[in-house]
Amino acid sequence: MATMHDKITLQLPAKPEYVSLGRLSLSGIASRAGFSYEAIEDLKIAVSEAITNSVKHAFKGEEDGEITVEYHIYEDKLEVRVSDNGTSFDLETRKQEIGPYEVGEDAEMMRIGGLGLFLIETLMDDVKLYYDEGVSVVMTKYINEKQVEENAKSIST
């Protein structure tokens, strides 16, 4: 198990205008940790999606919501936890409601919802959801792509 070097916590009002603050702080942290430009862009998109999901769904426009973004910096990875204490949801029920997306499906005809989490899972190396008081999304990105391959081998054997 990797040893955590630093933890940075950011408290954001659950308002759309603060999503960029989470993205900007992440960019600086990931750059300092040694991530490539491409990996930083993936991280920024994933974290923006997670924060936006909290703003849009957990608090539904209420003014008093708060989102916590934690950056856990390890020697080989960055773990980002986006948590809210708003309205929770059941992922499996939500997946059934929106149904699967088909290859070649017309983008203009796609249903609204569900793409944010799909995008996060696509861009990150590991994603976990926790339903405590609200929802927490824990996203992990390894600095070295070989680490992802090594972890995959150890899991499959």
From Swiss-Prot:
- What terms describe the molecular function in GO for this protein? ATP binding; protein serine kinase activity; protein serine/threonine kinase activity; sigma factor antagonist activity
Under SUPFAM superfamilies, the record lists: ATPase domain of HSP90 chaperone/DNA topoisomerase II/histidine kinase (SSF55874)
Enzyme class (EC, first level)? transferase
Give the UniProt keywords, A-Z: ATP-binding, Kinase, Nucleotide-binding, Serine/threonine-protein kinase, Transferase
Catalytic activity as recorded in UniProt? L-seryl-[protein] + ATP = O-phospho-L-seryl-[protein] + ADP + H(+); L-threonyl-[protein] + ATP = O-phospho-L-threonyl-[protein] + ADP + H(+)
The UniProt record lists the EC number as 2.7.11.1
Classification via InterPro entries: Anti-sigma-factor_SerPK, HATPase_C_sf, RsbW
Gene3D superfamilies registered for this protein in UniProt: Histidine kinase-like ATPase, C-terminal domain (3.30.565.10)
Membership in a protein family: Belongs to the anti-sigma-factor family.
- Function noted in UniProt: Negative regulator of sigma-B activity. Phosphorylates and inactivates its specific antagonist protein, RsbV. Upon phosphorylation of RsbV, RsbW is released and binds to sigma-B, thereby blocking its ability to form an RNA polymerase holoenzyme (E-sigma-B).
Q: Which HAMAP family match?
A: Anti_sigma_B
State the protein's name: Serine-protein kinase RsbW
Species? Listeria innocua serovar 6a (strain ATCC BAA-680 / CLIP 11262)
Gene name per UniProt: rsbW
